[in-house]
């Protein structure tokens, strides 16, 4: 719902008093089947209680959900040049800066579907460039999807069908604390509660294996290479599956006999899944590791069923990529400077552009966590952020906005890219959605 005070009436931001979705304040309330926006899995089975002290996760919590839902908001008001102003004035100043800019950069993009659609509309109107703060990790996937294609599974298919799960070079438990609980070792499956136990293989040493336990898990195997060598180990696995001889008797400490044993497990699997998380693959040319993971899937589909599953997707990055794709035809790093969408994954990477002095205004959206700080830059910055967002210096314009799924309703695209999940308004604070603020800025241009 559009906040009527955005363009004129005085604002009071934020109020942490409990309220209903309509804005009417109420006593404590308990919410069932709450979707969590604080990681890409968007677990939608939480129970959250709201009282006059704030929110508390009562059921199906993890560290990320507790930190996100139960965070106390500091006082925050709209600012222009570091001084408190009414919201309408901040919006008018933001519109003025965008109207004067020759090449505005729209970054951060931690928002929901509606917020991202508003970003795309404003970027098109102002001739700007769109890129998510975490797109460097996303492009480890995009480059392979664009050049060779892939075969992927979903969270539900993996949960219900997989008998072999290979975790490739990625600390999945750190990124998704409930992945093993919900997907790898759930209490039952959709098709057969007496399904045989599944084998879990970790390729990489130092990965958190503590959650790889439960009644659904049989053998847990580790091939202890450096995580950045996981692609090379999988490449050797592909070679052995194809019948090639390898001269080295080991790959980064992984014995060829262990690779051969994994090859035999892959041959016998009825439904295998290779899991990786691009944020974990933080080394040069990591897309080549992703190419090996997806190539293994293609090879094995000649004789059995195998699929990939890419994880990650924090800060609404999956949503940003999805909305950008269906709105412009391109997955982020899109320029509207010519009046039409233009795509270049190098030229329009906002991180590179800021480092090299390109662009004359940064519009930064960070509505989910307080950790997605705008990068240091000499150009004016407009920030639409959750209260408590870490800022190195006062931006030209600061507008506090709500978190989707906490302060207002919304939608986020899940990490497997097959569904957008509805987010509830839990009434934590009376903060406007980023989508409403962006629409008001566009209306004021």
Model feature map: region roles:
Residues 1-240, 278-279, 443:
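N-terminal export/assembly segments and adjacent metallocofactor-ligating motifs
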Residues 10-11, 25, 70, 206, ...:
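Compositionally biased, intrinsically disordered low-complexity regions
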Residues 28-45, 282, 311-329:
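N-terminal, charge-rich interaction modules
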Residues 48, 298-311, 394:
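Internal hydrophobic scaffold segments of catalytic domains
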Residues 122-129, 295-303:
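Short helix-loop-beta junction
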Residues 128-148, 207, 305-332:
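Short connector loops at secondary-structure junctions
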Residues 142-301, 335-445:
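Non-catalytic alpha/beta scaffold blocks inside enzyme catalytic domains
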């Amino acid at each position: 719902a559009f906040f009527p005070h955005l363009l004129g009436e005085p604002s009071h931001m934020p109020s942490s008093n409990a309220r209903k979705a309509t804005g009417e304040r109420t006593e404590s309330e308990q919410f069932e089947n709450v979707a969590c926006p604080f990681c890409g899995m968007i677990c939608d089975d939480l129970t959250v209680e709201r009282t006059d002290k704030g929110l508390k996760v009562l059921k199906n919590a993890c560290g990320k959900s507790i930190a996100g839902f139960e965070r106390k908001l500091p006082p925050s008001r709209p600012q222009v040049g570091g001084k408190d102003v009414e919201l309408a004035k901040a919006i008018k100043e933001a519109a003025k800066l965008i109207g004067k800019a020759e090449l505005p950069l729209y970054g951060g993009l931690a928002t929901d579907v509606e917020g991202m659609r508003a970003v795309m509309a404003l970027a098109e109107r102002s001739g700007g460039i769109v890129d998510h703060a975490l797109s460097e990790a996303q492009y480890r996937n995009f480059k392979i999807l664009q050049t060779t294609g892939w075969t992927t599974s979903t969270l539900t298919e993996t949960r219900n069908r997989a008998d072999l799960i290979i975790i490739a070079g990625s600390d999945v438990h750190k990124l998704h604390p409930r992945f093993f609980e919900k997907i790898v070792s759930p209490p039952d499956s959709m098709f057969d509660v007496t399904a045989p136990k599944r084998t879990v293989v970790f390729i990489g040493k130092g990965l958190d294996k503590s959650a790889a336990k439960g009644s659904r898990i049989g053998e847990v195997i580790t091939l202890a290479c450096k995580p950045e060598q996981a692609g090379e180990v999988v490449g050797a696995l592909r070679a052995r599956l194809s019948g090639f001889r390898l001269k080295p008797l080991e790959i980064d400490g992984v014995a060829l006999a262990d690779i051969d044993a994994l090859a035999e497990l892959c041959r016998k699997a009825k439904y295998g899944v290779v899991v990786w998380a691009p944020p974990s693959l933080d080394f040069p040319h990591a897309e080549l590791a992703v190419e090996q993971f997806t190539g293994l899937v293609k090879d094995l589909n000649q004789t059995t069923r195998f699929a990939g599953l890419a994880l990650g997707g924090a800060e609404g990055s999956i949503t940003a990529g999805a909305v950008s794709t269906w709105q412009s035809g391109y997955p982020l790093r899109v320029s509207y400077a010519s009046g039409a969408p233009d795509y270049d994954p190098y030229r329009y990477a906002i991180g590179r552009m800021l480092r090299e002095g390109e662009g004359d205004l940064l519009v930064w959206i960070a509505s989910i966590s307080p950790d997605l700080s705008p990068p240091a830059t000499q150009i004016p910055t407009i920030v639409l952020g959750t209260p408590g967002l870490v800022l190195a210096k006062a931006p030209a314009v600061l507008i506090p906005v709500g978190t989707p799924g906490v302060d207002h309703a919304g939608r986020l695209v899940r990490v497997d890219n097959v569904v957008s999940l509805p987010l509830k308004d839990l009434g934590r604070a009376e903060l406007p959605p980023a989508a409403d603020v962006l629409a008001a800025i566009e209306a004021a241009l």
